[in-house]
Design a protein with these regions (language model features):
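Core catalytic lobe of class I
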Residues: 1-200
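S-adenosyl-L-methionine
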Residues: 203-230
Length: 230
């Protein structure tokens, strides 16, 4: 299936070519990022080390390393290693002497995180997030991507690091989950994706965001939202 395709494409990278690729897109992300903005980067043990090192080489500051714990992780069918049950998320800013990036600290303490098994109400948010990887039916209605992220985690990240009306760029948008979350949250969005089939899925999802929002029980836009297809 698609996951096998993803792994095949990963195997086609040499370490040198992956480092070159990573430097290329990170440099551009750093160039266009406003001093008041920040970026979130998902990764696994396959690539997060290279991304971390490249951020340091480019002068990109890593604000936090977040561990997304998945208690419902996919089982290890081969039985040859431990079951992977987390992803790493790097939260980064442009770098430099001034730290101007936006952070909604009050939301991080007092927002509604009832879906997170570790977040204590009214307490500072920590760097381990216990959030199910299950997707709602409305998230899969128009198709799916092998590394598709649940809307609930994306909305959290968007709210923590941006204001309503801000512009969000997703350079590897897949089936458009980040764009959908951004639109729900009232942000402007730009999404980039090479695969035409995923672009079509993203376009369909974005066209039905009102239905998605209603199914999530979010009929008002007071907490989070923006990202795009083409």
């Amino acid at each position: 299936g698609d996951w096998n395709k993803v792994m095949q494409e990963w195997d086609d990278f040499t370490l040198e070519s992956y480092m070159t690729f990573t430097k290329s897109w990170l440099s551009e992300a750093q160039r266009i990022l406003k001093p008041t903005g920040s970026m979130w980067i998902f990764g696994t043990y396959h690539n997060i080390g290279v991304i971390n090192v490249m951020c340091q080489m480019l002068g990109i500051e890593i604000i936090n390393e977040v561990i997304w714990y998945k208690k419902n992780a996919f089982p290890n069918l081969a039985g040859r290693r431990l079951t992977a049950s987390h992803e790493t998320i790097l939260w980064c800013n442009k770098g430099g002497k001034k730290r101007e990036y936006y952070f909604d600290y009050e939301y991080s303490k007092s927002g509604d995180f009832s879906y997170d098994g570790l977040k204590a109400p009214g307490k500072q948010m920590r760097t381990v997030w216990d959030i199910s990887n299950n997707k709602e039916k409305c998230e899969l209605e128009y198709g799916k991507h092998p590394t598709q992220k649940p809307i609930r985690i994306l909305k959290r990240m968007i709210k923590l690091a941006s204001r309503e009306g801000d512009i969000m760029l997703t350079p590897f948008s897949g089936s458009g989950s980040e764009c959908v979350a951004a639109k729900i949250m009232g942000r402007k969005y730009i999404g980039i994706e090479l695969d035409n089939s995923y672009c079509e899925i993203a376009i369909n999802r974005l066209a039905h965001v009102d239905e998605t929002e209603e199914q999530f029980g979010q009929l008002h836009l007071e907490l989070f939202e923006s990202a795009v297809a083409k």
